[in-house]
Amino acid sequence: MEKIIGLIDAPFTPFYANGDVNLEPIEAYAKMLQKNGLKGVFINGSSGEGYMLTTEERMLLAERWVAVAPKDFKIIVHVGSCCLRESRRLAEHAQKLGVWGIGSMAPPFPHIGRIEELVKYCEEIASAAPELPFYYYHIPAFNGAYLPMLDLLKAVDGRIPNFAGIKYTFESLYEYNQCRLYKNGKYDMLHGQDETILPSLAQGGAQGGIGGTTNYNGKELVGIIEAWKNGDIEIAREKQNFAQEVISVICHYRGNIVGGKRIMKLMGFDLGPNRTPFRNMTDEEEQAMKKELEAINFFERCNQF
């Protein structure tokens, strides 16, 4: 099964001011991401407020991304839902569209507390799209599924034929690396924390990853990997430190989903508000964040259109 090389973006979902999904910006969005070195998108995930979209909206978004995606631009669809039947519908739909792959995080409800429960959940979704690579999206801060991922790989091995790997959005570089080394790298371990790309590269990983701050800082994050490959360690270190500075700023403004989406507006690409219950930034907060970003010369280094 093909492994992903390079960084995949987790895009925001564009909304009109009234909260309806806005499909219009997606073509320009895809072109911008590719221009800045991103290799594809992982849509309808946490950055895209996927759990706050209807099934029909998620399908429309998938259709639009597929329709306008540049050549060789990978489309991976997050199909996770609290309703397994809806997840299977989304997986079947994604396969019919001919996307590159699908993925799912554990549901926020009901809480999954055992590996066998998680395996069964993944198995039923993956079987609805047997022709597509399936990635488990490990982000326990969102759903409480603090389960050992090496045990998951051992449990799915030989049981879920199209299980491709894990989008690993957690703090344990030790566990990430142990999963990466399992059976000489059998599974694709996609690094999911933009703040630690460089240390992951030092372990031999991060050949592929999925990020959220790649929406606006993708050029610099791609540059970390390029500098590492070229042996330019100091450049890679500087770019990683800059990425952490950007992340420190958005952490002052409710993180990537809220603060990051507003950065897109400051860059001239307004993707609209967040859906309730997210608390949108005020105009005063926006101006304060802009000043913090200007202080680190963000707008001279951010993604270009």
Briefly describe each language-model feature range.
Residues 126-132, 140-244, 250-251:
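Catalytic alpha/beta core domains of metabolic enzymes, predominantly
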Residues 27, 59, 63, 88, ...:
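Generic alpha-helical structural signal
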Residues 36, 60, 64-69, 93-97, ...:
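Alpha-helical structural signal in soluble globular domains
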Residues 29, 90, 196-197, 260, ...:
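Residues within well-ordered alpha-helices
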Residues 49-50, 110-111, 172, 198, ...:
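Short secondary-structure capping/turn micro-motifs that flank functional sites
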Residues 2-145, 303:
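Active-site beta->alpha loop and helix N-cap motifs at the rims of alpha/beta catalytic domains
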Residues 3, 8-12, 36, 205, ...:
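C-terminal alpha-helical cap/extension of soluble enzyme domains
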